[in-house]
Curated annotation (Swiss-Prot):
This is Pterin-4-alpha-carbinolamine dehydratase 2, mitochondrial. The keyword Metal-binding does not apply. Pfam families: Pterin_4a. It is an enzyme of class 4 (lyase). One of its GO terms (molecular function) is 4-alpha-hydroxytetrahydrobiopterin dehydratase activity. GO terms for biological process: tetrahydrobiopterin biosynthetic process. InterPro entries: PCD_sf, Pterin_deHydtase.
Length: 187
């Protein structure tokens, strides 16, 4: 179910609609969906360790759909950093990113080599546009004159959440080839 539907379902009080009647109504209307979800492989779906949806309900992440998801606002008192094992599982879905452990804080890290200093700033602008639309902001570093480095983690909890992987997946989809240095071909 989508994250938008869950808060509405949980906000219905028992006196308004009995749970059995609600389930039967949903089941009758969406038999195909219920049948399909009951047949899904556990290998293709992982429970998010963030548990950080607006409703407080757990979110489920099909590992292939990170870039289509939207970052959700953090409620620091209910949100916990994911374990290193959970982070390793999701890391497979964000090609090119590495896990870094900085003073017991897990972070996502990636580097690019750009053509020039100004191309690095252009790169940052493209990342900033995504970060603003997601409401989740990475640390951006321009090291030397052409090394772009990005670190992502959820600052409010001092660790990684699903939001960090969503942002990394969206950064991976950026069209930045025009900004990157071409690798020299061995002769």
């Amino acid at each position: 179910m989508s994250r938008l539907l869950l808060p509405k379902l949980f906000s219905i009080s028992r006196t308004q609609v009995p749970a059995a009647s609600l389930f039967n109504n949903l089941y009758r209307r969406h038999k195909r969906f219920v049948h399909w979800t009951s047949k899904m492989s556990t290998d293709s779906v992982r429970s998010s360790t963030t548990g950080g949806s607006a409703s407080g309900a757990r979110t489920f992440c099909s590992l292939a759909d990170l870039s289509t998801k939207k970052c959700v606002p953090c409620n620091a008192k209910d949100l916990r950093a994911m374990t290193e094992q959970s982070a390793q599982d999701l890391l497979q879905k964000v090609a090119g990113w590495d896990l870094a452990n900085d003073n017991d804080t897990l972070k996502l890290h990636r580097s690019w080599r750009v053509k020039s200093f100004t191309k690095g700033l252009d790169f940052f602008q493209r990342v900033a546009d995504i970060a603003e639309s997601e409401g989740h902001h990475p640390d951006l570093h321009l090291v030397g004159w052409n090394n772009v480095k990005i670190e992502i983690w959820t600052h409010a909890i001092g660790g990684l959440t699903e939001n960090d992987f969503i942002l990394a997946a969206k950064i991976n989809e950026l069209q930045v080839e025009d900004l990157l240095r071409k690798k020299k071909v061995a002769k």
